[in-house]
Amino acid sequence: MASILSPVPVLAAGGIADINPGLTLWTAITFLVMLAVLAKFAWGPIVKMLAERERSIREAIDSAKKERAEAERLLAAQKESLSKAQREAAELARRNQQEVEALRQELTAKARKEADELVAEARRQIAEELVKAKAELKAQVVDLAIDAASRLVKANLDEKSQRALVEEYIAQLPANRAA
C-alpha cells in the first residue's frame, strides 16, 4: 500500500528499463486520436480565432498608425496655423506702429503748421498795429505841431517867451496822452 501512495519509490525501484511498451503504445495512440479529433473539430476554430485575432490586431495597429498620422497632420496644421497667426499678429503690430508713427508725424506737422500760421498772423497783426500806432503818433505830432504853431502865432512872443511856451506845452503832453 505504501508503494501505491508514493510513486517516487516505485519509479526508483524499477528504473528506466522498466518502461511498459503497451502503455506507451496506448498513450501514443490516444495522443494521436486526440490530435486527430482536435485537428478535425477544434483546430479550424482555433486557427480561425487566431487569424481573426491577428486581423483585429493588424487593423488596430493600422488604425493606430492612421490616427497617429492624422494626429501628426493635425499637429502640423495647428503649428502652421499658430505660426501664421503669430506672423499676422507681428505684421499687424508692425503696421499699427507705422500708422501710429505716420499719424504722430502728421499731427506734429499739422501742429507746427498751425503754430507757424498763428505766429505769422500775430506778426501781421503786430505789424498792422505798429503801422496804426505810427499813423496815430504822426497824426498827434502833426496836431501838436499845428497847435504849437498856432499858439506861437497868436502869442507873437519873443524868443524867451516862445521857449517858455513850448516847454509848457511839452510838459502838458503826457497829460494830453492820458486824456
Curated annotation (Swiss-Prot):
<keyword id="KW-0138">CF(0)</keyword>
<keyword id="KW-1133">Transmembrane helix</keyword>
<keyword id="KW-0375">Hydrogen ion transport</keyword>
<dbReference type="GO" id="GO:0005886">
    <property type="term" value="C:plasma membrane"/>
</dbReference>
<dbReference type="Pfam" id="PF00430">
    <property type="entry name" value="ATP-synt_B"/>
</dbReference>
<keyword id="KW-0472">Membrane</keyword>
<dbReference type="GO" id="GO:0046933">
    <property type="term" value="F:proton-transporting ATP synthase activity, rotational mechanism"/>
</dbReference>
<feature type="transmembrane region" description="Helical">
    <location>
        <begin position="27"/>
        <end position="47"/>
    </location>
</feature>
<keyword id="KW-0066">ATP synthesis</keyword>
<dbReference type="InterPro" id="IPR005864">
    <property type="entry name" value="ATP_synth_F0_bsu_bac"/>
</dbReference>
<keyword id="KW-0997">Cell inner membrane</keyword>
<keyword id="KW-0812">Transmembrane</keyword>
<comment type="subunit">
    <text>F-type ATPases have 2 components, F(1) - the catalytic core - and F(0) - the membrane proton channel. F(1) has five subunits: alpha(3), beta(3), gamma(1), delta(1), epsilon(1). F(0) has three main subunits: a(1), b(2) and c(10-14). The alpha and beta chains form an alternating ring which encloses part of the gamma chain. F(1) is attached to F(0) by a central stalk formed by the gamma and epsilon chains, while a peripheral stalk is formed by the delta and b chains.</text>
</comment>
<dbReference type="InterPro" id="IPR050059">
    <property type="entry name" value="ATP_synthase_B_chain"/>
</dbReference>
<comment type="function">
    <text>Component of the F(0) channel, it forms part of the peripheral stalk, linking F(1) to F(0).</text>
</comment>
<protein>
    <recommendedName>
        <fullName>ATP synthase subunit b</fullName>
    </recommendedName>
</protein>
<dbReference type="GO" id="GO:0046961">
    <property type="term" value="F:proton-transporting ATPase activity, rotational mechanism"/>
</dbReference>
<keyword id="KW-0406">Ion transport</keyword>
<dbReference type="InterPro" id="IPR002146">
    <property type="entry name" value="ATP_synth_b/b'su_bac/chlpt"/>
</dbReference>
<comment type="similarity">
    <text>Belongs to the ATPase B chain family.</text>
</comment>
<keyword id="KW-0813">Transport</keyword>
<keyword id="KW-1003">Cell membrane</keyword>
<comment type="function">
    <text>F(1)F(0) ATP synthase produces ATP from ADP in the presence of a proton or sodium gradient. F-type ATPases consist of two structural domains, F(1) containing the extramembraneous catalytic core and F(0) containing the membrane proton channel, linked together by a central stalk and a peripheral stalk. During catalysis, ATP synthesis in the catalytic domain of F(1) is coupled via a rotary mechanism of the central stalk subunits to proton translocation.</text>
</comment>
<dbReference type="GO" id="GO:0045259">
    <property type="term" value="C:proton-transporting ATP synthase complex"/>
</dbReference>
